Amino acid sequence: MMKTCRLLLFLLPVIAVVALGACRKQPAQTQQNANSNATPSAQDSPASGVATNGERFYFRGTIGDNLRIEMALLRDGERLTGTYFYPKVGKNIALSGTIDKDGNVSIGESDDGGKQTGVFKGKWKPATDSPDPILNEIEGKWSRPDGSKETAFLVTQQPIEITGAARFAPKVIKEANKEKRYTVAAEYPQIDGDARFDKFNREARSLITKDVAAFKTAETVSETDPGNETPAEQTDSTLDVSYEIRSATDDLISIEFTEGDYERGAAHGNITTTVLNYDVKNGKKLALADLFNAKANYLGAISSYCIKELQDRMRKDKDSMLDADMMKSGTSARADNYKAWAITKKGLWITFDPYQVAAFAAGPQYVLVPYSALKDLIKPDGPVGSFAK
């Protein structure tokens, strides 16, 4: 799968294929009514002939191993129309196609003159590795109209329910330093068209620019350290940052960032998950404690649920690479173990990074802790109080 392929960026010295474990498979039926209020990208402006009726869906994903794309589609019965673009380019490419009753998709892309330049063919199906079972993904092959240059693609629906003129617009930091031998490719979201989200924009921008600066500083120090010389043929250091929107409403934004960094000369890279949970109404970044009643043992409740879920998973899947000793330490009721939490409609989406509960090759592990398991602890008038009712 393409989500698995993204990890290749961090294993360049050995070109090892890394399997992202614990992907819980979901029934392969087509779901048309999921997230019908999704807001398209800031660049989305329907081209001539695009349908004006139907349900709108916003997707993020990749073509090939690492060509990221944003896609906005309008689904009207069997008809699909919309646009997609590459964040590092920013130019819309028109889309028009069909979807049948079994979810088989064929979408042609065309240039400004109407000439077809490519075709997406794949399957519209429930998303895997998603905290919300009603979200969808489209997976398949992109090719030129004649079938050449065939490349795998995967795009996942984003749960955007922001009203008004506000639109998500990805920003890209891309840098290559040949002298210091590092490359940076980092994305972070901005919300255009509504001043309510200005503080969120500053927080998201600051989070990623600081991480990029820290990476560059570390590379500069490493490069000047005479005891840290590496052969010229070794792969350059890299920092790659991508994100998923876990929740986006007028009041709350939850963004999950995946940061993959590789230090020149290392056996493999590292993967770190950072989540920005932002209270738009009150203009502040949320701490996990903000969701719960005073003195509530929320860490104990979250820990207990995650331990049971991961133990069940390990019993059912002998190839899961989950490690009992790692799990004992990595799921204990300590704040450090639950730094990567995201807000969703269904519950708190907890991410355990590699080596926290499983081997590196297993990839990050995910647990959705439903609000029903935390209902008695959640602050009724707090940020997620309405979800827990």
Annotate each predicted stretch with a short phrase.
Residues 2-10:
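Bacterial N-terminal signal peptides that target proteins for export
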Residues 10-16:
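Hydrophobic helical h-region of N-terminal Sec-dependent signal peptides
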Residues 19-22:
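C-terminal motif of bacterial Sec signal peptides marking the signal peptidase cleavage site
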Residues 26-34, 38-79, 83-389:
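Compositionally biased intrinsically disordered regions enriched in Thr/Gly
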